[in-house]
Amino acid sequence: GETIEQAGRAGELCFAGATVFDGYLGTSNDGVFTADGYFRTGDLVEICGNPPHYYQIVGRCKDIINRGGMKISPTELDTLLEGYPGLVEAAVCSYPDEALGEKICACVVVEPNQPAPDLTAICSYLLKRGVAKFKLPERLEILDALPRNPMGKVVRAELQVIVRDALQKVRSGAHRT
């Protein structure tokens, strides 16, 4: 890959050194190291501040949404949506699209006794906070809870399954969101 040296740009954190392991035991190590021997962490980091720079982890590379060639960090949208009035929690995930590769779905949990937002309201909220139009979700799923791992982190892969199941129901005429 390329070395990123300017603040505001994000890339995958890779490193090498005498104490870096040689690979995983008993499994394929394809893609674990770069061509020049750097270990690929899978963490997406952004360079921040003026020199000396510091690095901030902004997400996982596997979670990046590729919508028509545009790379979108779901973490940015998650953070903004968590401030939406009447929501307990929110996260976005991708779902397959023939034309664009992937589209974005906002998955939200609404506070008890609060009205559920609609997609137009969610998009308007995001636009007012400076989100580019290509990053806006095309779908909204209202959930009882977001799937989480034992550490409490949202499991996007499970969100994607929920969204795909909902899309299947829509296509079969059994569900509307």
Residue map of PLM features:
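Hydrophobic alpha-helical segments, especially N-terminal targeting/anchoring helices
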Residues: 1, 7, 33, 41, ...
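Conserved ATP/PPi-binding loop(s) of AMP-dependent carboxylate-activating enzymes
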Residues: 2-36, 70-72
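Residues that form generic nucleotide/phosphate-binding pockets
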Residues: 32, 125, 162, 166
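Acidic/polar alpha-helix N-cap and adjacent early helical turns
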Residues: 161-177
